[in-house]
A protein has these predicted regions:
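Generic beta-sheet signal
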Residues: 4, 86-88, 117
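Short beta-strand-to-loop acidic/aromatic patch adjacent to the donor-nucleotide binding site
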Residues: 84-96
Length: 151
């Protein structure tokens, strides 16, 4: 059984979304897999924190866009624990899981040569690569020139 790390930042007003996120993902997302929830929050307490799989991590709220820019630094505060997991998923705070998503339909199948799982942000569906938010700075190691990305 795979162990799934659920990365969730809910500071400030976003804490209101946590209970429904937890309930729908616990019920519908990858049934049969062990899930560990890493909740980065400024709330003094959160719903379901009595569940041993819920890890509340104190995190001050940042104004946007700093909250987005510091996302990976925030997540890496838990690097040692995260290295013990098979898969990591970061979720926007307002996401819910309404339908059952099974491991067979979602996780990579190593026996078929699959090693990675990629999820496309819905904002990019049906867009031409020219309009993707690639880094266009030629001095950046992540640089992708216009008309050179892939859908």
């Amino acid at each position: 059984m795979a162990t799934i790390g659920m990365l969730y930042i809910c500071t400030g007003k976003y804490t209101v979304f946590w209970p429904e996120f937890y309930e729908t993902f616990s019920r519908n997302f990858l049934p049969g897999c062990k899930k560990e929830y890493f909740i980065f929050t400024d709330a003094p307490s959160i719903a379901h924190e009595d569940d041993p799989a819920v890890h509340r991590i104190a995190q001050p709220a940042y104004d946007w866009p700093l909250s987005t820019m510091k996302r990976f630094a925030i997540i890496l505060t838990q690097q040692k624990a995260l290295e013990q997991l098979d898969y990591l998923f970061f979720f926007n705070a307002n996401l819910t899981c309404r339908e059952v998503i099974t491991p067979e339909e979602f996780l990579p199948r190593p026996q078929q040569g699959e090693q990675l799982l990629l999820v496309q942000q819905p904002g990019f569906w049906n867009k031409k690569p020219m309009f993707y938010s690639y880094d266009r700075n030629p001095r950046c190691t992540a640089y992708i020139p216009y008309n050179c990305g892939r859908a």
